[in-house]
Amino acid sequence: MVLHPLRGSSIDIHPNARWQQTGITVAGGNRQGNGINQLSKPCGLYVDDDQTIYVAERVNHRIVEWKRGATSGQVVAGGNGQGRGDHQLSNPSDAIIDKERDSLIICDRSNKRVVRWPRRNGTSGETIISNIDCVGLTMDENGSLYVTGFEKDEVRRYRRGESQGTVVAGGNRYGNRLDQLFAPNYVFVDRDHSVAKQGIVVAGGQGEGNDLTQLSYPEGVVVDQLGTVYVANAGNDRIMRWPKGATQGSVIVGGNGSGEQSNQLHFSAGLSFDRHGNLYVADQENHRVQKFNIEFNG
């Protein structure tokens, strides 16, 4: 079962949309490092309406902002060494924007907390959820947070002001039943907000592999207005599209073996679209973010 966050505004993508097969590096790409023009194992990815990219850098313990066309980024959270201080992060895995409060909300994974950090000129964060081994999170339009609990194999919803939250997926020990999850990474919430006792497999579920019916280490996921599922299939170094009700997916970018060429990926983690339908991928082991421009969108 695959779950992941809504990234920015909802997207309208034509069912026959195609993307350029060669990506453009829009963040990092200057080898692994902690310079402002470098990334180190980018994972969670958020693209704002103006195509500004926010990247969670696990190894550098920071969140960086890369504006459209920039050759270097700006640290907007963390970056003060690994630690538990209010001004520090430890292996952050995801970050989203709360536009209403003009702040970042960050999965500070190794500190087992979710923190809110002022988006502009913030020097420290505020812990809003404690004691949670979170990997991914998202927010619906009502301001409720959905956070994955990796250790407890569950997803919890936190309405505004709540500190405990409610289990909305999994929470029945780890396993492969439809009412179970196994080490969930990222979570996506659509506009339906329905909560069910059992899930429905919408992609994969046929064992690990590289057939079009299979996934291997699925990471980032986005769902469009038609219910089409887009999956960062990290273990196969490709991005796949699964139309609603489909029994197999199709490769939309990557799938050319693991590598650092512009048509290749190496453990694709985060996944996002901008409002035009252009695709962004956190290419983790290449320490870069790749943009694949949309060629056709109806």
Regions found by a protein language model. Name each.
Residues 61-64, 112-115, 153-156, 199, ...:
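Structural signal for beta-propeller blades
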Residues 194-195, 212-245:
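Loop/turn-rich, solvent-exposed surfaces of beta-rich toroidal or solenoidal domains
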Residues 50, 58, 100, 109, ...:
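Short loop/turn segments immediately following the C-termini of beta-strands
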Residues 8-41, 70-93, 120-133, 162-185, ...:
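Gly/Pro-rich loop segments of beta-rich domains
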